[in-house]
A protein has these predicted regions:
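Alpha/beta enzyme core
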Residues: 1-79, 106-120
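Short acidic, glycine/proline-enriched helix-loop-strand junctions
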Residues: 30-36, 79-96
């Protein structure tokens, strides 16, 4: 990582440190902003924002967290449907359909279609 810092990198990312001690050593050795990649079930310790800052890390990403949550939600929803035959009394939170469409930007897609598709 130091070679990249010396070459002018703005942020340094060291792949998968496996202990707090290793992360602390990286923080002591490299005088550039450090990026931690936090993956539940990965090699890097799961640390809080404060713990990361104390070790010298200024940035953290959590790239898999939402995917893991989505997987658990999908499994829960379909297990409920399989068991009950319905989504009634589902414990898993769901978006309202229109709110989900807006979240996904479908309103912009539909406006684009309306403006540009032929009326023929």
């Amino acid at each position: 990582g130091q070679a990249f810092a010396d070459a002018g990198a703005d942020i340094i990312f060291i792949e998968s440190p496996e202990s707090v001690d290793e992360m602390a050593e990286i923080g002591r050795r490299i005088d550039k902003p450090l990026l931690a990649n936090i993956v539940v079930g990965g090699s890097t310790p799961l640390l809080s924002e404060k713990e990361l800052a104390d070790l010298g890390y200024q940035l953290a990403i959590f790239p898999g967290s939402a995917f893991l949550a989505m997987g658990a939600a999908v499994e829960s929803v379909y297990a409920h449907i399989k068991t009950t035959g319905s989504t009634e009394s589902l414990d898993t939170p769901l978006y309202e359909f229109q709110a989900f469409n807006q979240l996904m930007g479908f309103d912009k897609v539909w406006a684009f279609e309306k403006a540009w598709l032929s009326q023929d």
